[in-house]
Amino acid sequence: MKHLLGLRELSKEDIIKILNLAKDMKTILKSETKKTPHLQGYSVVTLFYENSTRTRTSFELAAKFMSANTTSISVQTSSVQKGESLLDTVKTLEALKTDVLIVRHAVSGVPHFIAKNCSFSVINAGDGMNEHPTQALLDMFTIRERLGTIERLKIAIIGDIFHSRVARSNIWGLSKFDNQITVFGPQTLIPPYIENFAYVASSLEEAVSGKDVVIDLRIQLERQKRGFITSKQEYYKFYGLNEDIMRYISGSTLIMHPGPVNRGVEISSEVLQLPNSTIDEQVTNGIAVRMAVLYLCTRKEGIYR
């Protein structure tokens, strides 16, 4: 497995292999030392052109727990601020003997561009509105761990579908396992082509009723200057997960969110604290999944053919 650029190009068997290995990695996380030599001698670099807490820290911990040499580049203090191009930046990292680059960028397709122009492995940590493959993988891992399967489930994805790379990766991944996927959100935030891949519900009540999993998405407030929603208060009233809407959701239905959470906008604090809320579990599972991805990307034999 040379790269992980997206779930669209992975097979069902590829995903299962990653999830199975992540289960083994989680056993390591539960040990007292949380340490394995699998990446000893490897150089792992994180290059984030967008802000991140969970993904960046999770990747860095995953690499360190596997004994890699890790470096985190702050774009704000790098030569990017002097006008250095993306290509020159990654070519510099190649000359510095990087083995794995974990990259996040606001422009879709950047990880694919880097993979075509450099010799090291590339892991996509989020590219524009395209994909966020490791977030979807950790979501799938969490679902399988809680429910025992990721096949033939009824899954709702609620919120800002239009801008969400998390939604796209989850749809690409979950659709390979014969799941019924429903989406719902403001009409301005539902892509016109989404009906080819998921059922579009007409109300929040319809969207969440009878579901095994509800994935709530972050409203990307940094994009709201374009007027996709009228106000945060109105969004919460019609699309937020609160105590009233929980009447339509079973106590066994998983409530998921990729984070960061805008409390009182997408979801209430009370719902976040329910036993069927998996948000903290998702963060922990993210380390195990990213350990698995790093392991596979540094092995000559792999799942990419």
Curated annotation (Swiss-Prot):
Pfam families noted in UniProt: OTCace, OTCace_N
Gene Ontology MF: a single term: amino acid binding
Keyword GTP-binding included in the entry's annotation: no
Binding site for carbamoyl phosphate: R54, T55, R104, H132, Q135, G259, P260
GO CC term, one of those recorded: cytosol
Binding-site residues, L-aspartate: K82, R165, R218
PROSITE patterns: CARBAMOYLTRANSFERASE
Functional pathway: Pyrimidine metabolism; UMP biosynthesis via de novo pathway; (S)-dihydroorotate from bicarbonate: step 2/3
Enzyme Commission identifier(s): 2.1.3.2
Coiled coil location: none
Catalytic activity: carbamoyl phosphate + L-aspartate = N-carbamoyl-L-aspartate + phosphate + H(+)
Keyword tags: Pyrimidine biosynthesis, Transferase
The protein's enzyme class: transferase
Domain of life: Bacteria
InterPro entries found in the cross-reference section: Asp/Orn_carbamoyltranf_P-bd, Asp/Orn_carbamoylTrfase, Asp/Orn_carbamoylTrfase_sf, Asp_carbamoyltransf, Asp_carbamoyltransf_Asp/Orn-bd
UniProt GO BP: 'de novo' pyrimidine nucleobase biosynthetic process; 'de novo' UMP biosynthetic process; amino acid metabolic process
HAMAP family: Asp_carb_tr
Protein family: Belongs to the aspartate/ornithine carbamoyltransferase superfamily. ATCase family.
Quaternary structure annotation from Swiss-Prot or TrEMBL: Heterododecamer (2C3:3R2) of six catalytic PyrB chains organized as two trimers (C3), and six regulatory PyrI chains organized as three dimers (R2).
Functional note: Catalyzes the condensation of carbamoyl phosphate and aspartate to form carbamoyl aspartate and inorganic phosphate, the committed step in the de novo pyrimidine nucleotide biosynthesis pathway.
Protein name (database record): Aspartate carbamoyltransferase catalytic subunit
